[in-house]
């Protein structure tokens, strides 16, 4: 893991020792001084690791299922298996988004700690042990060494702390099948940061992958792709408002969406959401 909190890294190591259920090596990269980007950190740690199955994990994660190491290892051993994680999407559109599109594309099996509560997130509509996906969130990623070595994390395009997970899992998905694991539960204790840097990185990611997108975990009719395009546009507008990023998606973007889709339920929800999120942002700014 990439560590800026030695106490958190020790808690994670203790948790892994109690739950993994198979031989492992724990590498904590002390990043407090250098502040190296995650692509560089993960490539260095993977190159130094002794085993052939790798886990790139945030230090603010807790494994809650005993024996998870054997469950993951058995799936990774399949020749066509790429990356395994705990939250992902069945498609990645050309339209600017994060790692999912705000609709039925989400596949997830983890607990998110936020606002003082533990919130289980379980999206497994097919009822399978491992859900095929294209992209994965980077809180915890498992991959075979040979798959990592064919792809590597892109240190040049993503030198900081965003985009590495989507880029890496898209690259692996070009040759292998990625999965969300529904047999192991983990808890994630942070929700990520959505800033101007995050937005710039997502735009850089989309420029890099423009000629390959959209990508799908399974064949999808054009009508379904068009539906996700509409859903994801509305979702991203609301998401940017929720995170206070009105500089990226403002009131005008919402009005343009409503003008194009006046009868859509997604349109009707935009105005009240804008009022709520804008007022919250104003109050937050006043407290500073």
Over which residues does each language-model region extend?
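Short, well-formed alpha-helical segments that are part of the catalytic scaffolds
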Residues: 1, 5-20
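Glycine-rich, basic loop-to-helix element that forms the pyrophosphate-binding segment
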Residues: 33-49
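Short aromatic/hydrophobic "clamp" motif used to bind/position activated sugar donors
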Residues: 54
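Conserved donor NDP-sugar-binding/catalytic core segment of glycosyltransferases
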Residues: 62, 66-107
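A recurrent flexible, glycine/aromatic-enriched loop bordering the glycosyltransferase active site
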Residues: 119-143
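Donor nucleotide-sugar recognition loop
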Residues: 135-136, 145, 149-171, 178-187
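Active-site donor/metal-binding and catalytic loop motifs
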Residues: 175, 179-225
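Non-catalytic, C-terminal membrane-associated alpha-helical segments of glycosyltransferases
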Residues: 200-203, 224-288
């Amino acid at each position: 893991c990439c560590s800026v909190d030695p106490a958190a890294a020790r808690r994670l190591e203790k948790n892994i020792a109690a739950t993994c259920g198979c031989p492992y090596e724990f590498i904590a990269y002390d990043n407090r001084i250098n502040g190296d980007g995650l692509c560089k950190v993960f490539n260095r740690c993977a190159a130094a690791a002794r085993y052939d199955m790798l886990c790139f994990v945030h230090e603010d994660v807790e494994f809650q299922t005993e024996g998870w190491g054997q469950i993951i290892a058995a799936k990774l051993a399949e020749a066509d298996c790429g990356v395994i994680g705990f939250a992902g999407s069945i498609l990645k559109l050309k339209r600017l988004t994060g790692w999912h599109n705000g609709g039925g594309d989400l596949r997830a099996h983890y607990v998110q700690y936020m606002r003082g509560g533990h919130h289980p997130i379980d999206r497994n509509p097919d009822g399978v042990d491992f859900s095929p996906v294209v992209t994965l969130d980077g809180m915890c990623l498992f991959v075979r060494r040979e798959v990592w070595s064919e792809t590597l994390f892109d240190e040049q395009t993503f030198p900081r702390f965003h985009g590495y997970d989507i880029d890496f899992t898209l690259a692996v998905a070009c040759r292998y099948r990625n999965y969300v694991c529904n047999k192991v539960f983990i808890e994630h204790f942070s929700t990520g940061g959505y800033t101007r840097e995050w937005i710039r990185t997502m735009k850089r990611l989309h420029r890099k992958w423009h000629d390959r997108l959209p990508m799908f975990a399974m064949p999808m009719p054009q009508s379904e792709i068009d539906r996700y395009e509409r859903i994801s546009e509305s979702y991203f507008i609301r998401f940017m408002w929720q995170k206070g990023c009105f500089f990226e998606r403002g009131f005008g973007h919402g009005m343009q969406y409503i003008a194009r889709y006046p009868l859509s339920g997604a349109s009707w929800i935009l105005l009240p959401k804008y009022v709520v999120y804008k007022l919250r942002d104003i109050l937050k700014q006043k407290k500073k």
